[in-house]
Amino acid sequence: MLSAMGCTPKTDAGDATTTPENPELILATTTSTQDSGLLDFLLPLFTEDTGYTVKTIAVGTGKALQMGRDGEADVLLVHAKSDEEKFVEEGDGTERHDVMYNDFILVGPKEDALNLKEQFGNDIAGGLKAISDNMATFVSRGDDSGTHKKELAIWKSADIEPAGDWYLSAGSGMADVLKIADEKQAYTITDRATYLSMQSDLGLEILIEGDENLFNQYGVIPVNPEKGETINNEGAVAFMDWILSEKGQNLIKEFGVEEYGQPLFIPNAN
C-alpha cells in the first residue's frame, strides 16, 4: 500500500528553514499506522516542519524489516519489539526507540454465540481455546505482520496449533481482515486503533481485551546506510527525531480523541 506509560520525548522539532539536500524519504511501516489514519495526520506536519516528503509503504512488520535489510526503505515504524531489537543487533538498523503503544483486542460477532465476553473477559488464551474447541471461524492476518506474530504467540501459549476449515489465513492487512471477519461473522485479533477507525462500518464488537499479552509496542528504526547507496540516513534520523520530539509525541496523543473520545495510540518515547 503506497501513499505520498509516561514519555520523555526529545526536544521539540522546529520548523524547516532550508530544503534538505535529499528531500524524499521512504518509510516502511505497518498497515495499522496507515489504516488507522495516523500517518495521514502526522506526515503532512512532519513535511511542514522538516521539508522531507515521505513515501509510505504499508506492509506487515516482517516485510517492513525485510525491506530494511534489502535497503529498500530509509526508516521503519513497526511493532514486533524482539524482532526489531534483533534487526539492530544484526547491524541492519542503527538504533531503535519506543514511540507509542496501544493494544490488541479480540473482536467477533455482536451475538457472541460462544459467550466469550462474559466467560473470558480479559483471558485471550482462554478465548482462543474456546474458538478452537468449537471450530468457530477465525480470520488470521497470515502475513508475517506484528499482529500475525502476536496471534501465533498466543495460540502457542495456549498449546493450540490452529488448523482446519475454521481457521482462515487471509494474507492481508488489518483493514481487509476486519472486513472479511465482518462478512463471515468470524473472530479475529486486531490492533485497537484500526478497529476503532472502522467500528461504525463493522458488525463486530470487542469481546476480549486487557490481557497483558495483548500489549502492542511500536518502535522507530533508521536503516543502516550501509544497506544501500540510496539510503537517506539524514532523512531517517530527521523522522526519528521528529516523531520522538515533544511535538510529535503530543500529536500522537491527540490523534483520535476528537473523533473516538480516546487516543488511538499512547506516546511513550524513550
Residue ranges of predicted features:
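Short, conserved active-site loops that position catalytic residues or coordinate cofactors/metal ions
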Residues: 71, 102-103
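C-terminal motif of bacterial Sec signal peptides marking the signal peptidase cleavage site
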Residues: 2-6
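Acidic, polar ligand-binding/catalytic clefts
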Residues: 75-101
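Exported/periplasmic ABC-transporter solute-binding proteins
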Residues: 7-47, 62, 66, 72, ...
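Conserved beta-strand core positions
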Residues: 25, 52-54
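Serine endopeptidase catalytic core focused on the charge-relay Asp
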Residues: 106
